[in-house]
Swiss-Prot record:
One of its GO terms (cellular component) is plasma membrane. This is Probable potassium transport system protein Kup. It catalyses: K(+)(in) + H(+)(in) = K(+)(out) + H(+)(out). It comes from the Archaea. One of its GO terms (molecular function) is symporter activity.
């Protein structure tokens, strides 16, 4: 029995799929107009030259870093229709010939994942807080204390994280239509404002971006760290390609690009007419219609919640990939949808993320301070994605695409260097957060390798020879016993100890091996009953994003077990790194809990290992 699932390619995606992509992918980019120009012009004087130059830079940033890098280059790389950092790693590693290159890009992939996690802590905080601060534009609420706004933002964030366990399958159907209304609102309000100052349309000309740097010098370079806020969330275009499809995302981006850019144009036009504003989006909307401002504010808060939800779902997906590819230890995963393969919930991650977001809100307190800390991890992730693209196109000898990727990556690195200046203004936070999963991955993977070497698994031929002899002479226990191993070629020490040292051999002994494939989705299994008398092998192969029900597969294979054995390690060490590794192993759920094996049938076999 086998099944393989890949995203379908459509020449003309349906309107439903495009609307769904608009809701699930572009929340972060779609809410960036709330704060990008407001923060930039706290940093720069709002002169006509700076306003024209800033809008010009925003246009070319969206065009180069989002349109070219992700919708044009990155999306053509995956042959299976999947996206994300680990997918790029899976594409590149088989193409590399030197082990040193494999090690470097594996480390880069780990760094990229860690930076995305660091970025995703700040995203919900800045999105929700910046929207809530719009309350001050309502007459009578101009002097509301910031503490109350922070409290409201924390309540919204807490409600969002409390809601995760229930799953978002039902409400996610409304995300697309709501975000389409949001984008239409951005476009219409921006277009009306542009009509009063049509000269702002000239900002598309890159000469204004060049003049911006000439006039501002080094200050102009550091301004890129604020300009890049318009492109936050670009990685989601590529990462979400697997379950939404390339074409719906590309078509949706055409609509979103126009809507978002017109909002920037409208805000810039409003700034040309009113240079003393604090937040051009809020004040522009209020000036257009005071009556509609409160509905707009409510819509904006909902849009930021949807954007935050997409980020949280993305984190669950990244962590799940890292678990199945053995980069992170096993964490209990709940499946919140019977239909959508990507709808998962990881309780530990959810509450750690919730605590981190609330701490960020309490530490920074103002959206402009959060903006000053935001962007370093974003540009770092983009630079890593660009490096992978260059290497893949080079290995495939697609030199034209490689050249384009090289130019784009140089732009990414330029933005990254500009955001380094944010480290002293709070940018260190995303690095500190990213350092936590990065350190855990390095320690865990190194520990697993050391553990594997110390455990000294038994080879296939030696195991079969000893098993045949033992099965003939030993007294058989009634029923069927299950054992878990990576493969029959390397049989874990706990199996040989159980069968040969402790002489525990059942009438039927089934060794189950789980093989994680390089492809994201699809699974197959094969049950070989004829290895030796009383010995069978169930091999299960599945993609690193595929969700499997292990006990259901065992039942489908016709196996009715009496006992399930699995290996446990007692690590003895004086090395501080291995002590941390041992603590990680103890704190994380066991193999039994992860795969939801029936606890009353399970027996753990402890092996003492010195590292």
């Amino acid at each position: 029995m086998s099944r393989r699932t890949i995203s379908k390619t459509m020449e003309h995606p349906s309107k439903t799929s495009i609307i769904k992509a608009a809701g699930l992918v572009f929340g972060d980019i779609g809410t960036s107009p709330i704060y990008t120009l407001a923060v930039l012009f706290l940093f720069l004087p709002p002169t006509p030259e700076n306003i024209m130059g800033a809008v010009s830079l925003i246009f070319w940033t969206l065009l180069i870093m989002v349109t070219v890098q992700y919708t044009f280059l990155a999306m053509r790389l995956s042959e299976t229709g999947e996206g994300g950092t680990l997918v790029l790693k899976g594409i590149l590693i088989p193409l590399l010939k030197k082990p040193k290159g494999v090690a470097v890009f594996t480390l880069l992939a780990t760094l990229g994942i860690s930076l995305m996690i660091g970025e995703c802590v700040i995203t919900p905080a800045i999105s929700i807080l910046s929207a809530v601060e719009g309350v001050r534009q309502i007459p009578g609420f101009e002097l509301i204390a910031q503490d109350w706004l922070i409290f409201l933002a924390i309540l919204i964030a807490l409600g969002l994280f409390l809601f995760q366990k229930r799953g978002t399958e039902g409400v996610s159907r409304t995300f697309g239509p709501v975000m389409v209304i949001w984008f239409l609102t951005l476009f219409i309000s921006g277009a009306i404002s542009v009509a009063f100052s049509p000269e702002i349309l000239l900002a598309i000309n890159p000469i204004y971006a060049v003049e911006f740097f000439i006039h501002n010098g080094l200050l102009g370079f550091f301004s890129l760290s604020m300009i890049v806020l318009c492109a936050t969330g670009a990685e989601a275009l590529f990462a979400d390609m697997g379950h939404l499809g390339r074409e719906p995302i590309q078509y949706a981006w055409g609509f979103v690009f126009i809507a978002v850019f017109f909002s920037y144009l409208g805000q810039a036009a409003y700034l040309l007419r009113n240079t003393d504003v604090i937040n051009p989006l809020f004040e522009m909307i209020f000036s257009l219609s005071q009556i509609l401002y409160i509905p707009f504010l409510l819509l904006m808060i909902i849009a930021t919640i949807i954007a935050s939800q997409a980020v949280i779902s993305g984190i669950f997906s990244i962590i799940y990939q890292a678990i199945t590819t053995h980069l992170l230890p096993m964490l209990p995963v709940d499946y919140t949808s019977d239909e959508l393969r990507t709808q998962i919930y990881i309780n530990t991650v959810n509450w750690l993320l919730c605590i981190a977001v609330i701490c960020v809100l309490l530490i920074f307190q103002y959206s402009e301070r959060l903006a000053s800390a935001y962007g370093l991890a974003v540009t770092g992730t983009m630079s890593i994605t660009g490096s992978f693209m260059i290497a893949i196109f080079l290995q495939r000898r697609k030199y034209l695409y490689m050249g384009i990727a090289l130019i784009v990556t140089l732009v990414d690195i330029t933005y990254f260097l500009s955001t380094v200046s944010k480290i002293t203004h709070g940018g260190y936070l995303s690095l500190v957060i990213a350092a936590i999963p990065f350190t855990i991955v390095i320690i865990y993977t190194s520990g697993q390798r050391a553990l594997y070497r110390s455990m000294k698994p038994m080879g296939h031929d030696q195991f079969i020879k000893k098993y045949t002899r033992a099965y003939k002479t030993a007294r058989h226990l009634r029923g069927t016993a299950l054992f878990f191993a990576r493969s029959l070629d390397q049989v874990p020490a706990y199996i040989s100890r159980t069968m040969f040292n402790n002489e525990i051999i059942y009438e039927e002994n089934v060794i189950i091996s789980l093989d994680i494939k390089d492809e994201p989705y699809g699974f197959s299994w094969h049950f070989d009953k004829s290895i030796e008398p009383g010995l069978s092998h169930l091999s299960i192969s599945y993609g690193y994003m595929q969700i499997i029900d292990l006990m259901r597969i065992i039942r489908d294979a016709g196996i009715e077990e009496k006992t399930i054995f699995y290996g446990m390690e007692e690590i003895v060490t004086r090395n501080i790194i291995w002590k941390i590794f041992s603590a990680i192993k103890r704190l994380c759920p066991s193999f039994v809990q992860y795969y939801r094996l029936p606890s009353h049938k399970v027996h753990g076999v402890i092996t003492r290992v010195e590292l």
